[in-house]
Amino acid sequence: MIKEIFLGEKMDKIVKHPSVLDGKNPNELRGDSITNDRYFCKDFMDKEWNHMWTKVWLIAGREVQIEEPGDYIVHDLVKESVIIVRQKDGSLRGFYNSCAHRGQRLVECDSSQDSFRCPYHDWQFGLNGDVISVPDEDDYPQGSPVGKRKLVEVRVDTWDGFIFYTM
């Protein structure tokens, strides 16, 4: 059956005639030129950011880069930074590289550690993104943030050894 699909008549039916061309001549689909402003125009960059980059799966790295619990990679894209970290159960989780307290960047480069510590106010986050300690925990008038606050998570998945995330 598979051989027929790729080598026989069924293949012709699958790829011979695209179903939607919006009335365009297929010979003219790539005829328009791309203007230089696509590469340096802020308005175009903003449109790409709002309508594409925040809605697609992005490659963060390879699974072999973070094999042990606590291993993590940092992926920066324009104004965002994401941490992908190997969990103790072997799964992967991703978080914005930004403290849940005041937004300070947590880590600068790929490494391995048991937790993430904010360099600004010293909040500590577990590998699962939960706040696990803060200085002077009893001094918070609204109550301790430990166990209540966490890093903002991004969706992570893998395919064939590649690590992907989406915002």
PLM region spans:
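Short amphipathic
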Residues: 59-63
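Rieske [2Fe-2S] iron-sulfur-binding domain
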Residues: 65-166
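A short, polar/charged loop/turn motif at coil->beta-strand junctions and beta-hairpin connectors
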Residues: 52-54, 69
